[in-house]
Amino acid sequence: MQGNEQQAYDRGITIFSPDGRLYQVEYAREAVKRGTASVGVRTEDGVVIAADRHARSPLIERDSIEKIHEIDSHVGVASAGHVADARQLIDVARRQSQVNRLRYDEPASVESLTKEITDYIQQYTQTGGARPFGVALLVAGIEDGEPRLFETDPSGTPYEWQAVAIGGSREDIQTFLEEEYAEGMDLEGGIELALRALASVNEDGLDATGVDIATIDVESEQFEKLAEDDIAERLEEFELGGEE
């Protein structure tokens, strides 16, 4: 009988269960967990986002797997979950960023951009004939000379973090970050921490072709993706690469 009651609340995303739950939003969070992990680290002089983009098949073209995106020159996003859902939210963020520049002749703040994204996500938790977004985002950037790092949730709730993981193995990676994160670390230290966090749940080590890293530093306020050679160099330096 209890299963039948739950099934009834499953069918409508706009209906709360008697104990105050929105089952479809909870299922969307499960979809995020099925995605490969992404990590964000805020440092004294910038912010780092890193993503595991290893191919699930050797026949997949690596370049077709993209988990880190530039939103504006000072903002980047990493995703975990349904790729198509992520693309739609990234388009929303890019449009809003362009609108802000055209309307106010200045870049959008990282916080306001995040809230625009989460407001859009939230609409899909109370609209009939739609479903929640099965994706979480890390929104990283520089605002008024300060690094900012936010997480979006399928419920439409934004959270600000010093260091955070989304996607598969989130709990294990988050525990690692909580143990290893230190206030005052520089951008290079943030890159190392992000790579070590991803490696902590990968027994075979990391491959430069299967990791994306981007930084936005306070001085230049410019989004920059690390080249594959730069990632390989750091993996070798930190002894995080897989066996040949």
UniProtKB/Swiss-Prot annotation:
Cellular component terms (Gene Ontology): cytoplasm; proteasome core complex, alpha-subunit complex
Family: Belongs to the peptidase T1A family.
Pfam families in UniProt: Proteasome (PF00227), Proteasome_A_N (PF10584)
InterPro entries in UniProt: Ntn_hydrolases_N, Proteasome_alpha, Proteasome_alpha-type, Proteasome_asu_arc, Proteasome_asu_N, Proteasome_sua/b
UniProt activity-regulation remark: The formation of the proteasomal ATPase PAN-20S proteasome complex, via the docking of the C-termini of PAN into the intersubunit pockets in the alpha-rings, triggers opening of the gate for substrate entry. Interconversion between the open-gate and close-gate conformations leads to a dynamic regulation of the 20S proteasome proteolysis activity.
Species classification: Archaea, Methanobacteriati, Methanobacteriota, Stenosarchaea group, Halobacteria
GO MF annotations, alphabetized: threonine-type endopeptidase activity
Entry function: Component of the proteasome core, a large protease complex with broad specificity involved in protein degradation.
Keywords (A to Z) from UniProt: Cytoplasm, Proteasome
Compartments reported by the entry: Cytoplasm
Protein name: Proteasome subunit alpha 2
SUPFAM superfamilies: N-terminal nucleophile aminohydrolases (Ntn hydrolases)
Coiled coil: none
Organism of origin: Haloarcula marismortui (strain ATCC 43049 / DSM 3752 / JCM 8966 / VKM B-1809)
Quaternary assembly: The 20S proteasome core is composed of 14 alpha and 14 beta subunits that assemble into four stacked heptameric rings, resulting in a barrel-shaped structure. The two inner rings, each composed of seven catalytic beta subunits, are sandwiched by two outer rings, each composed of seven alpha subunits. The catalytic chamber with the active sites is on the inside of the barrel. Has a gated structure, the ends of the cylinder being occluded by the N-termini of the alpha-subunits. Is capped at one or both ends by the proteasome regulatory ATPase, PAN.
Gene: psmA2
TM stretches of this protein: none
